[in-house]
């Protein structure tokens, strides 16, 4: 069986419900519907990428985001960077055969031995540093000079900065390795990935055959 590549989306889904992760990332038998919110998020990320990297003015309807982009004008920003990491913690290509984990970082600002990570968010606020910490250990794998990591989400819909997180990439990586060990065990033994009931089951999960699903 083809090995699973770790990513924030996969790990977040697997931790919440392995069964949903199996249907979404292994069987790939769930319908994909690109919602208007998803389309908007893609347009916003594309516009902010051009604004931060090339100083291209933001399009109509995104003017309120200018203050967040302008705050980065005098900093050495790496924008929409695709990163890969091996199982041994070394940097590698995003699509390399030995990639264990991959991610795309909205904005990274390295300076001396520290790095600030900015992640644009167009959805509802959820101050969980997990995604930022995953970016941190992938950035470190590709730049061993960096030691300290800080991160912020920018909640664009609410027009505000999120809280500053002091990131712990080591603790996050150790946890993620344990999760991926569970994935490997499930794949090795060919058993069904278990369903974990959670707050999203009743109204939001697309795995309609699951006993916890409320959308049937």
Which positions does each model-derived feature cover?
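Short amphipathic alpha-helical segments and their helix-coil junctions
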Residues: 1-3, 19-32, 114-117, 180-191
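Nuclease catalytic cores
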Residues: 2-57, 80-81
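Metal-dependent nuclease catalytic regions and adjoining charged, substrate-binding loops involved
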Residues: 5-6, 86-91, 97-98, 127, ...
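Residues that form generic nucleotide/phosphate-binding pockets
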Residues: 13-14, 25-26, 47, 51, ...
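Short, charged/polar micro-motifs that form catalytic or ligand-binding hotspots
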Residues: 30, 34, 38, 122-126, ...
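Catalytic cores of nuclease domains that cleave nucleic-acid phosphodiester backbones
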Residues: 43-117, 123-130, 141-156, 164-165
């Amino acid at each position: 069986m083809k090995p699973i590549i770790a990513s924030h989306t996969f790990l977040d889904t697997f931790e919440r419900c392995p069964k949903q992760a199996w249907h979404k990332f292994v069987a790939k038998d769930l319908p994909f519907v690109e919602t208007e919110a998803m389309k908007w998020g893609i347009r916003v990320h594309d516009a902010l990428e051009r604004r931060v990297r090339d100083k291209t003015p933001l399009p109509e309807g995104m003017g309120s985001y200018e203050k967040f982009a302008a705050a980065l004008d005098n900093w050495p920003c790496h924008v929409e960077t695709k990163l890969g990491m091996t199982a041994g913690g070394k940097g590698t290509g995003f699509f390399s055969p030995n990639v264990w984990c991959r991610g795309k970082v909205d904005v990274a600002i390295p300076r001396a031995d520290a790095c600030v990570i900015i992640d644009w968010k167009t959805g509802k606020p959820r101050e969980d540093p997990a995604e930022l910490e995953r970016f941190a250990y992938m950035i470190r794998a590709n730049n061993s000079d960096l030691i300290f990591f800080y991160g912020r989400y920018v909640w664009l819909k609410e027009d505000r900065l999120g809280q500053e997180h002091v990131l712990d990439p080591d603790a996050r990586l150790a946890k993620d390795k344990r999760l991926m060990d569970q994935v490997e065990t499930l794949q090795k033994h060919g058993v069904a990935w278990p369903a974990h009931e959670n707050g999203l089951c009743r109204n939001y999960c697309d795995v309609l055959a699951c006993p916890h699903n409320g959308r049937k």
